[in-house]
Amino acid sequence: DNILYSSEVLHENQYISYGPYEFIMQHDCNLVLYESGNPTWASNTGGLALHCRATLQTDGNLVVQNSANRIIWQSNTGTGTNGDYLLVLQKNGNVVIVGPPIWATGTGR
């Protein structure tokens, strides 16, 4: 799957992927985007803590937290408004956070 939904968590060694891309919460607490096994982006939090997890919060902020729930890195994208946010690993290797729809038919079941 290439999507992380609001409140979903990537624990150690869990990832989302799309084609040659993998966005993984490593065991060393570094959140890294790989293309074909080569790192292309990182949170640079490797070695700062143990047993970390990455969470997409309900306000749209992506955070890396240690086992004591302390935030050691964040995307600083919190909107102050809770909603249905998605972190998407796109087919071009870009990782984006998108927010609630601004219009819908209201026919979803």
Swiss-Prot record:
This is Mannose-specific lectin. InterPro entries: Bulb-type_lectin_dom (IPR001480), Bulb-type_lectin_dom_sf (IPR036426). The keyword Disulfide bond applies. Its main location: secreted. One of its GO terms (biological process) is response to other organism. Disulfide bonds join C29-C52. It comes from Aloe arborescens. One of its GO terms (molecular function) is D-mannose binding. The keyword Secreted applies. It is found in: Secreted. One of its GO terms (cellular component) is extracellular region. Residues 79-82 form a propeptide. SUPFAM superfamilies: alpha-D-mannose-specific plant lectins. Mannose-specific lectin. Shows agglutinating activity toward rabbit erythrocytes and mitogenic activity towards mouse lymphocytes.
